[in-house]
Structures are given as structure tokens and as C-alpha cells.
Amino acid sequence: MKWSTKQRYRTYDSYSENDLESLHKLALKSPWKSNFHIEPETGLLNDPNGFSYFNGKWHLFYQHFPFGPVHGLKSWVHLVSDDLVHFEKTGLVLYPDTKYDNAGAYSGSALAFENSLFLIYTGNHRGKDWVRTPYQLGAKVDKNNQLVKFTEPLIFPDFSQTTDHFRDPQIFSFQGQIYCLIGAQSSQKNGIIKLYKAIENNLTDWKDLGNLDFSKEKMGYMIECPNLIFVNGRSVLVFCPQGLDKSIVKYDNIYPNMYVIADDFTTGSKNQLKNAGQLINLDEGFDCYATQSFNAPDGSAYAISWLGLPETSYPTDKYNVQGVLSMVKKLSIKDNKLYQYPVEKMKELRQKEQNLLLADNNIITSNSYELEVDFRQQNSTLLSLMTNEKGDSALKVEIDKENN
């Protein structure tokens, strides 16, 4: 089904109870329901947002269009967790219900500040001429998970510097100062990251510090979802450069999710990642995008990704549902590369162990399992997973020890 702009931007209150019931019934018929991953009950899930720790709980939000597997009028769903494995949904909490976000509550981030969880997100406004104006908006979540929006934008767009592609604010604290990164397209149609600081850490008063300097390469035509985190004493920038030239880094997705590791983050006369290394793919898989990462109160760094891509269709679409989030990944640096590991609590999901030898030609009929592979002799090994009966369709993974 092709969705028109009018259908995508219907207001939420225009849907009846019967509409919602029909959506749920169809989604329940999907054979693609996951066992471990966060997914929507109906409609579209895309970017993870507001990943944070507050009031003794892990908090996570995701962008949501409840009414179909398309990018329509976005809102945020809120979840909380005690262990980063089991998440409990509190509900849809951030609606596109003001003049500043009447065309969608887009991506953003969160920071525990004083006695609340502070949210900053992009609100898309469209008028009768359908011209987009992106505002960076604020909200607070209290200890009872009640959300209240700020009435006025925190950061206004400056169209002398950027186009209307100006979104995905990431708020973070560094050396006692609160900063914000925003992905953008420059007025020259290049991908850039804008840097702001909260004046005297007042979260309603922001100063534009200019662009973040982290590479001499051209970063495509737009940067989405920038995140700056601190891992093992290094500064790590995770971001999504749309239109990146593949001569810079090879990638197979429509849009890549990249990272760079630097020695330090500095501001002042120059806003830069000092001695930033090469761009590296965050994930070599087919569907990993819009990764959101943050530093927990103890300094540990965690990340979670959308397992999906814009402008892509999936088998679940026929059931009016699309998108899941990755499992939470704990981050570390080894040999100047970013390593991503499942959190320790994932081990508690393990059940019966089964040892398989290639010589036995074992067949696993379940699609829910953890696979550990031990190969001692070969320099290269090819695994075929989820192979069909004919053997002509599979997920093939090549492990090359020599080239790592």
C-alpha cells in the first residue's frame, strides 16, 4: 500500500478505537515476532531516543508511528529497565501536539539533571505551504514518569548556516559543562555537526559554538544522529553520514553508521576531536542505523541501534508493523577499534547448552539461539545460517582470522 502525505500526517485523534483494534489484530498475525528485541505492537519503530539512567532505572524511548509501517507523524514511546535486558513499556508519552512539532516529534536524547530527566528533541513544524522548520524542543520527565513539555523552543534554526535538515540533538556533560551536538546539512549542502553549550548549564539557554571539526573528508550531504561518548579515556563520535563517498569508507547499507576515535574533545578557539582516527563502520550488517550511545553515571558506555533503514521495505510490512531495536551493547576500545559486547545480564537468558560438530551435520530448527563458534585450524571459515531446505538461500558469514 502506498501512503499519501495526507495519510501519513493524520492526527492521532482522528483514528477510531476500531481502527486501532484492526491494526492490533493484523500485527498479531505476523510470523516475524521477535523474542528478545524491542518492537512496536503496531506501526513503525525507528530511532532509539533518550537512552539514559535516571532515578535508579535505565530509560529508553523510540520514535513511533503507530498506524502503519511508514514514516508518518512521529511520537515517542517510553520504556524503563532494571537490567538493560528486560524493558517495560510505560506508554506513548511524547505526542506531536504543539505548533512546534505538529509534523512530528523526531529524534533526541536525555540527561538526568537535578530532579528530573531532561529531554531534548527535534520538533518538525510545517505550515500550510508545507515548508519544514525544525526546532530543538525540550521536555522533562519526573520520578513518576510524567512528562511535561517546555512551551518554547530551546534552539532555533539558523538558515544562514544550515538548510531545514537540522535535527537529532545529543545532550552530554563533559568536564562539568553541558553540551549538545546536532546533525545538519550546511547551506552548501554538506554534512556537518553543530556544537552548542548550555550557558552556565542553563538548559533553556544555549550558545552556538560552531561546527565540530573531526575529519578532513567531506561527510556526504547530511549527518544524522551524532553521539559523542567517552570510552576508556578516549573520545568516540558515533554518527550517520548520508551520501558519504564510498572511496572514503566502503559500506553496503543505503546510509552508513560510522564512528571515529579521538584522543580528546576540545572547545574554545577550536571545537575539535583531537587526533581523530579514520572512519570505521560501526556494524558490517545490513540493518544498523541511528545508533544512540551514552555514558552511564559510572562512566561505562552503552549503545543501542535501530535494526532498520530509511526508505526500505521489510516482510513485516504486510502486517502493518516494522522495525526492532538491537540489544544493548557495552562499549570498549581495543587495538584502536570500538568493541561492542552484550551486557552481562544477557547471560541469564541462557538455557540448555547444545554442542554441535560440523562432522555431525546437525540442523537447528529454532531461530532463537546464541551461537559460539570455535575454529582452531582454519584461517578462514564460512558459516551459513538460516539456510533453506534447498540450500540456495542463507545468511552467510565469513570469518577471516588473517585479515581480522
Residues of each region from the PLM?
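Beta-rich carbohydrate-recognition and catalytic domains
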Residues: 1-103, 107, 111-168, 173-219, ...
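Repeated scaffold domains used in trafficking and secretory/extracellular systems
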Residues: 224-226, 289-291
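Structural secondary-structure packing elements that flank or coincide with functional cores
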Residues: 296-297
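Substrate-binding/catalytic groove segments of enzymes
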Residues: 300
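Secretory/extracellular carbohydrate-interaction modules
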Residues: 347-404
